[in-house]
Amino acid sequence: MVRGKIEIKKIENVTSRQVTFSKRRSGLFKKAHELSVLCDAQVAAIVFSQSGRLHEYSSSQMEKIIDRYGKFSNAFYVAERPQVERYLQELKMEIDRMVKKIDLLEVHHRKLLGQGLDSCSVTELQEIDTQIEKSLRIVRSRKAELYADQLKKLKEKERELLNERKRLLEEVNMHHSSKGNTEGGHRTKHSSEVETDLFIGLPVTRL
């Protein structure tokens, strides 16, 4: 029988939680022992239950393993600390540069809007004037492009309307021409019938 997948979440029932803790703890220590024996590794496992009770397993003396771990952690921290501090310092310098750049851009933007010009020198005002002229040229160029595009679309629409008008006029003329031919045929037939009626019978002899 296939067992369903157990959802990993806190077990609310206290009795079930204690039973599961006991089973999982035993399984954990068993796996730790197997790892130690099979791979000739130093293994230590420390578990505190919810009630605060200590449970532990070690392949050798727990104190020696913990002491070894402490020395390794301290050595790793000491070796990595200068690199971390240098990275943080570089990051701080980069942030300072970005803040200064943003401040300069904000000041320049205000000057382009005509604000804070009292402290500007003649050279700065000339640079601002040049920048404004450049911006105006860009705006005018873009405006001309939009107008040209709009004019092109209007001309295309005008051409479509003229073609449609021409087509409708041709249809109207064809309709009138066809109607006129039909009425002319009717009139010719009627005249023939009238003339036939007039000449039927013997000619009258005059005295």
UniProtKB/Swiss-Prot annotation:
Keyword Nucleotide-binding listed? The answer is no
Q: Does the keyword Nucleus apply?
A: yes
Q: Give the transmembrane region(s).
A: none
Q: MF terms per GO, please?
A: DNA-binding transcription factor activity; protein dimerization activity; RNA polymerase II transcription regulatory region sequence-specific DNA binding
Recorded hits in CDD domains, A to Z, give: MADS_MEF2_like (cd00265)
Q: Report keywords, A-Z.
A: Developmental protein, Differentiation, DNA-binding, Flowering, Nucleus, Transcription, Transcription regulation
Q: Where is the MADS-box domain?
A: 1-61
Effect of loss of the gene: No visible phenotype under normal growth conditions.
The biological processes this protein is annotated with in GO are: cell differentiation; flower development; positive regulation of transcription by RNA polymerase II; regulation of flower development
- Cross-referenced Gene3D superfamilies, in alphabetical order? Transcription factor, MADS-box (3.40.1810.10)
The places in or outside the cell where this protein is found are:
Nucleus
Q: Which InterPro entries match?
A: MADS-box/MEF2_TF (IPR050142), MEF2-like_N (IPR033896), TF_Kbox (IPR002487), TF_MADSbox (IPR002100), TF_MADSbox_sf (IPR036879)
Q: What is its main location?
A: nucleus
Q: Which Pfam families match?
A: K-box (PF01486), SRF-TF (PF00319)
Q: Which residues form the K-box domain?
A: 88-178
Q: Can you cite an annotated GO cellular component?
A: nucleus
Q: What does this protein do?
A: MADS-box transcription factor that acts with AGL42 and AGL72 in the control of flowering time. Promotes flowering at the shoot apical and axillary meristems. Seems to act through a gibberellin-dependent pathway. Interacts genetically with SOC1 and its expression is directly regulated by SOC1.
Q: Which PANTHER family match?
A: SERUM RESPONSE FACTOR HOMOLOG (PTHR48019)
Q: Under what name is this protein listed? A: MADS-box protein AGL71
Q: Which organism is it from?
A: Arabidopsis thaliana
The gene that this protein is the product of is AGL71
